[in-house]
Curated annotation (Swiss-Prot):
This is Cholesterol transporter ABCA5. Belongs to the ABC transporter superfamily. ABCA family. It comes from the Eukaryota. It holds the Pfam family ABC2_membrane_3. It comes from Homo sapiens. InterPro entries: AAA+_ATPase, ABC2_TM, ABC_transporter-like_ATP-bd, ABC_transporter-like_CS, ABCA, P-loop_NTPase, R2_ABCA1-4-like. The gene is ABCA5.
Amino acid sequence: MSTAIREVGVWRQTRTLLLKNYLIKCRTKKSSVQEILFPLFFLFWLILISMMHPNKKYEEVPNIELNPMDKFTLSNLILGYTPVTNITSSIMQKVSTDHLPDVIITEEYTNEKEMLTSSLSKPSNFVGVVFKDSMSYELRFFPDMIPVSSIYMDSRAGCSKSCEAAQYWSSGFTVLQASIDAAIIQLKTNVSLWKELESTKAVIMGETAVVEIDTFPRGVILIYLVIAFSPFGYFLAIHIVAEKEKKIKEFLKIMGLHDTAFWLSWVLLYTSLIFLMSLLMAVIATASLLFPQSSSIVIFLLFFLYGLSSVFFALMLTPLFKKSKHVGIVEFFVTVAFGFIGLMIILIESFPKSLVWLFSPFCHCTFVIGIAQVMHLEDFNEGASFSNLTAGPYPLIITIIMLTLNSIFYVLLAVYLDQVIPGEFGLRRSSLYFLKPSYWSKSKRNYEELSEGNVNGNISFSEIIEPVSSEFVGKEAIRISGIQKTYRKKGENVEALRNLSFDIYEGQITALLGHSGTGKSTLMNILCGLCPPSDGFASIYGHRVSEIDEMFEARKMIGICPQLDIHFDVLTVEENLSILASIKGIPANNIIQEVQKVLLDLDMQTIKDNQAKKLSGGQKRKLSLGIAVLGNPKILLLDEPTAGMDPCSRHIVWNLLKYRKANRVTVFSTHFMDEADILADRKAVISQGMLKCVGSSMFLKSKWGIGYRLSMYIDKYCATESLSSLVKQHIPGATLLQQNDQQLVYSLPFKDMDKFSGLFSALDSHSNLGVISYGVSMTTLEDVFLKLEVEAEIDQADYSVFTQQPLEEEMDSKSFDEMEQSLLILSETKAALVSTMSLWKQQMYTIAKFHFFTLKRESKSVRSVLLLLLIFFTVQIFMFLVHHSFKNAVVPIKLVPDLYFLKPGDKPHKYKTSLLLQNSADSDISDLISFFTSQNIMVTMINDSDYVSVAPHSAALNVMHSEKDYVFAAVFNSTMVYSLPILVNIISNYYLYHLNVTETIQIWSTPFFQEITDIVFKIELYFQAALLGIIVTAMPPYFAMENAENHKIKAYTQLKLSGLLPSAYWIGQAVVDIPLFFIILILMLGSLLAFHYGLYFYTVKFLAVVFCLIGYVPSVILFTYIASFTFKKILNTKEFWSFIYSVAALACIAITEITFFMGYTIATILHYAFCIIIPIYPLLGCLISFIKISWKNVRKNVDTYNPWDRLSVAVISPYLQCVLWIFLLQYYEKKYGGRSIRKDPFFRNLSTKSKNRKLPEPPDNEDEDEDVKAERLKVKELMGCQCCEEKPSIMVSNLHKEYDDKKDFLLSRKVKKVATKYISFCVKKGEILGLLGPNGAGKSTIINILVGDIEPTSGQVFLGDYSSETSEDDDSLKCMGYCPQINPLWPDTTLQEHFEIYGAVKGMSASDMKEVISRITHALDLKEHLQKTVKKLPAGIKRKLCFALSMLGNPQITLLDEPSTGMDPKAKQHMWRAIRTAFKNRKRAAILTTHYMEEAEAVCDRVAIMVSGQLRCIGTVQHLKSKFGKGYFLEIKLKDWIENLEVDRLQREIQYIFPNASRQESFSSILAYKIPKEDVQSLSQSFFKLEEAKHAFAIEEYSFSQATLEQVFVELTKEQEEEDNSCGTLNSTLWWERTQEDRVVF
């Protein structure tokens, strides 16, 4: 069946991706809602800001003349002055007696410091005068009398409320100033001018009508509008980079996705979203107070173009990032940063307008400038419209054009960067690729069937490559020649592939084999174009994979299933398939049919409506494979396609691939050797990046295999030695591989195949040897692979160590002997015999040490605690600096004309103008003009008092005539804060000038520093105490919640099964947590008291706080331990509880203080309740009560308020709570902590009464297997036997477990789901029982019951010599070995530390532990990983570590739940050998669950297969094969020169030997048959006849083997599934989802 190369249009892919993106948007509601609501929220917030800060419009204000200068404004004034000299005393004498008699009282001070000290206790009517010399002085008023701001210019709004400038007049400042000036003038000239100065008038200058614009809300509006559209770009960037991070984009390109379609789909989607959002926002903005005068269309254009450009800016950033969490943050901060740059451009008036548009390539700056222009137009009641697009300092037309150009530029740049920036995967173009003609004019080339010489000549075949048959010559689809790939890792070159050369043929399935890290995935990535080779050549149907344009053509033929699951999480299975089918170019009218076919082929109809993220691991692999086979591609590249699948699912996949292999190329990698053996026509074994061999299974087995396996199922009377002698007599090369009470396994070499018939005849005739049945199977591909791997290690050693190559057998024998010894030593490790108390101390110390180091390594928790501390200390320091910076904030202001008046020749300044001078004296004022000239004051003459007409000006002087001299009216601008005293100073200096004195009077205004009032001090202290309480309560979850993490990863269960005493665990943690929390509290409390030294200190009261602290710390820590048992499903447990603690503390404070105003009694009752009920409150309540008691002048009336009452309960309650928490902790430990193996000396069992569990007899089942029934009777007999010599280590009797499913509302009843159905079995000492079954069969339920995680509904379990119900009270079972399916390992702890922790928990001494670690690392090849943290370990090493931990301490019972999951074949064999050796002839028992039948066959003494919660069969592997096996498999390899006629004769001969043999799919050189068991009456006769046929026909070699355990398993599960379906019972193929509480949901 041929398949044309798919051609798919860009627009069709764009429509498909649009649909995909739309569905994702609909299902990722959180981000989608934020994208919609975030802009609207900001818009409404800005409208609110506009309403709260409208432009203030002020009408024209006429001149306002103030009251005459009145000396009585200084009534009762206390005037202190310093220094005391003759001159200063004379001045103050004249002021107090001549100018202001009966008004002021003078006080003398020797220095300024004395005056300042005295001012602290003076009332507000105290004023200080500090003379610097006879002509200069400083006036010091209290801050509430005069302005204290250093800002020289006030707003119009500020003056309209309380004019600060006029305070100098109303406070008496100018009166005192004029009086002192008059006294100085009189002393200097003997002329009294007090009357003239006293006659000075003050006039507030009239102001024009004006609209005052507040720049702060404007800035907020501009920034918020810039940020408003950021969620679109933020989530878009995160989504695109996340797809890149998951490799989805690159694999979509392999499926034929056009880059244009990818970018266009996002552009169109977000263009639509932003169009609608911009339209809505524009309508709202123009209909509200935000832009009421502007055109909706113009505002819409601005919003729409900015939204587009900001989104495209985010698109441009995506090629620059590899992590999605980084790109979103950068996009947001770039948006804010450029928004502020644009704001600065607008606010800085001196910024050159010509340079503004230099920032136009950044859309955020351009948008800010445009919105600023809209606001500018709004100020003039015009608004933005099409008529004024070109008006203003920043024309809107330029903004619109630049935003449009920005959008185009960003999209083009995004596409360009995506093509040229090198990434982890994918081919990249050169930086100037768009200039090459080949890019614009691609020439299509059709693939061709290449002959042997098309590529680099003929690849020479050697002894490691099996030649293909003639029918495949010329069908080389994939040519690989000299491929090399080198990576840079930590500064070193790592060779992933080394000179790899071989061909892959059309019509064959080729398997790539090799352990982890050999380069299989790298080769796959090269073939599909994900990464280029460093050297060498590879082609797919003539298309070179290193050429990007040719690779695009090759990809049209490729379907790929990578190691990573490629799918869209929120889409359903059917949606994923449909969308990717459309991307692949499958015709629209065929998509539904194609998708349904894939769903049917892979048995996914029942999950087609499930979201991909909710699928199990095996189901996700099915989906990825289904995506790969969509459209029936010419080439399939599958990287571990069946990883994580159960055997039934794997067989479904195998059948699918076999069905689709004709005229196609299938390449897959796998760690399952049986999968490669059954499925692949050719296998390529890669080791260390080099090719070890290529050929069929028979070629590999015959060349590198170890022979046949002869398995015998024996009875208890079997004469093992006689039997072995018989086997050796016929086949001297036979070796005994495995031996137990029920089975013997021998290895028979290939070279002795002609002697097999004689051996089997002898076995048939010697029935007295105790052989019940026997079978023979050929060496597995696993054995071949391992032999090649050992050879690879020898090759590697040759180059570095040996000068002469040792024999392979010697090396192999030596290495395995060493490993055997290591493992025997490992299996003999014992826990030290220590007393219970010594063990308790050792465990407590170990847990404390581990907890301490864990806290040090948990950077997130440490950072969180330090951040909270930093917040508290920052607030403390900030408030302290604010408190002590008032003195520094009060700066002296020199009242000189330079503040507001220009000098002649100066240019206008922000608030500097010329001095207006009005002559109302009708006389010559030339001398006055001369004075201003001498003082460098620019003067502007006016004729009348219409100051508004010449506005703006800072001040004016109106010259009026008096009897002796001029009298002035000081006209000041109310926005110029210091203009009035400056005018008075100018007038005084004019009088001096007029009297021919060249010196000038200088004056400073310096307000007194006023201490913070007592109420402010109390509020500040109260606030900081409350802050301490809120922050300190947020800390314990960050270091005392480790138990929650231990429960999540099941580490606590593992520790308990290892013999950990619960009290040692909790006290060990408390030993670290309590001192740490205490130190933190002491630091915070100490800083609170240190920064508030004014706190009135009572020793007794402080001791009460200390006693409260001592009880509070353990109370909160213990409560946190109890809280860790709850809300286990929360992702961020520590953050969640930290937030809850803080909110609870804040709520308690708020409630108690609010109710205080309702009545003291209510507040006290609540305080008592909170102290008793809420453990985080007592310290807070105690501290606040202590502060209130310690306040100075606090009310002492006990009837109304007595803080001592509140203090006492806060001190006592933590100690009572500690007692309660200890009992509660024991209760939760008993209920949720799982089984304790050892008896705890401190934690007593709360209930010694055992549960009355029902022990019903199982219902009669006539169809129950006889072996299962015999096992049940055996268990029943053993349970009733009181004098048995040796009971089994594990006995399970009638174990039944039901789960309550969700209530069926239609039937108003609960539906029971049965997990296990009356299971009975036993495991003898020294035996390993394999527990097999498909997913949901009940294996994990049994394991969880055995470890105590869940309770059975009925039945009994006995472990060791005691029942599991009473094992907690008996100390006979010191520890149990448990290797769970999920690694219970701490990610930041090293491998060696794991050994040390578990060794100490199991009672091993430190000296023994060092030796044990050395043995374990040698035995399991872990030495190089000892100092690595778990998160850096490969999956296989983690499983080895779990196994090693389960074996520490010589446990009597070990439970191994899928121990070799995730390991490559070499590591699996290593693990299996370790398991076999550890339990070899030992008095310990083990149960092993697995999905790998070869694992059960290699490790287990007996196997029990479960289906649908029932035990289907039990027995040795050979027994099950003989009983349930359907037959044998015969494979014959013919010699090359055989003719078709002879092949026909051979087939007739096979049909004669095995009449019912059915021929399987074969090639011209290989014949394969399935032989029914009925046709093999005798193995000896079968081998005898096959040997005759080998000599009579051109047979090069053959293999004849029994059905594998995998085939038996599949047949059993299929039969059971048919029975279940017919009876309507639970289907075994359905997955059960197990929660942490082990509830099963159907």
